[in-house]
Amino acid sequence: AGFPEQEPEPKFWNDWAQKTLDKALSLQTLNKNKAQNLILFLGDGMGVPTVTAARILKGQLRGQPGEEGQLEMDKFPFVALSKTYNTNAQVADSAGTATAYLCGVKANEGTVGVSAAAVRSQANTTQGNEVTSILRWAKDAGKSIGIVTTTRVNHATPSAAYAHCVDRDWYSDNEMPADAVEAGCKDIARQLFENIPDIDVIMGGGRKYMYPKNTTDVEYPGQPKHSGTRKDGRNLVKEWVDRNTEKKGHYVWNKKDLLSLNPTKVDYLLGLFEPADLPYDLERNKETDPSLSEMVEVAIKILRRNPNGFYLLVEGGRIDHGHHEGKDKQAIHEAVEMDRAIGRADLMTSTSDTLTVVTADHSHLFSFGGYTPRGNEIFGLAAFISDVDQKPFTAILYGNGPGYKLVNGARENVSTVDYQDNSYLAQAAVPLSSETHGGEDVAVFAKGPMAHLLHGVHEQNYIPHAMAYAACIGQNR
């Protein structure tokens, strides 16, 4: 791909830097407006290496070298670092971290919406240790609230916004041990509808956890693995519909029904587009499955009608899944789609009254390197072969994961396989069935009112405090 022809001229770089300097100087007038609206974009597993790779991919999808491009999040004026550790884990999981950036307190791994006094899977440590989230603070302040995710709506990230649960895996009562049910613990799907009964917009996957056991799925009638899971016989979707129909509530399960809604006539929306997680963006059926950008657009159109403003949590949740599976291509394309959603939200909001924050819960053992030349195809090979085993290697590698593979006792020669395939497993140094999270700090990008409060190296649980202060909600009313 080479590089733009003006780059050898010092003037090009000096002019660019001076323009950037002008922008930086304009930031000396801080935006101290009150934030009417709050949007948090959470890229699950979107560490800095993932952000950089997504930037390059975004440019290359447009036929450019990629490195010089800008993601939407790159344009945000304020950037901080977030320390992601959980109270009991150096390398964090998505549940304890979600409790931090949504509820404002650090917590143990595997737990959502409870303090560190609660112990994972120990039902009797729930009561008295519940902590509320910024979603609740916003609702209490009269704002509309929404959750949009590409995972199950009762997955770790969204669940910390409304649930108090000592185990992130208690998706429905089917996944709970008997002692937890007897102790009166509620599964996460139930809590979605009962704890904050009037969440205005809920979109994502997770249909099967809402229906009685063996209820056939509407989209996959011939596949028992997608059938309902609930042992208590409740149909949570029907209960929601019965409760909300007269309040301009609509339930949808496919893209056509979603996009045929008139958002000015919808007050409550429940969209469950898959039995579990939504498909990867690269594998999405563009006729039946909405993209993250499409869901975000509908959500904002509904939420912004509230004169008191709104809080919206948007999760690009499958960046994380791609990395765990060692499928670098899926992960990075997911990150690019989340960036598109950030751009869509930008077109629909104003920095004068909307604070937008983009961050990750944790990183991954994902890296790219190998002295690749400018414009090197991001999923391509490094420019030279190994001087140890005389074989080529891809620029992208994982520290551990399912991509560890030996052929005749030696590292696989990647030139003999299709490393451009969507489901190719990038090579990993240590064999694991699932690649792990990374422990380093993650970036926090912020723009809008009081965005300058996100400015240095912070504990992750500081994020909702800064956002709440900007909107004068929660402890900062």
Curated annotation (Swiss-Prot):
It is an enzyme of class 3 (hydrolase). Zn(2+) 2 binds at residues 44, 361-362. Pfam families: Alk_phosphatase (PF00245). PROSITE patterns: ALKALINE_PHOSPHATASE. Signal peptide: none annotated. InterPro entries: Alkaline_phosphatase, Alkaline_phosphatase_AS, Alkaline_phosphatase_core_sf. It is found in: Cell membrane. The active site is at residue 94. Binds 1 Mg(2+) ion. Binds 2 Zn(2+) ions. Its main location: membrane. The keyword Transferase does not apply. It comes from the Eukaryota. Gene3D superfamilies: Alkaline Phosphatase, subunit A. Mg(2+) binds at residues 44, 155, 157, 315. Its EC number is 3.1.3.1. Glycans are attached at residues 124, 214, 413. Homodimer. This is Alkaline phosphatase. It comes from Gadus morhua.
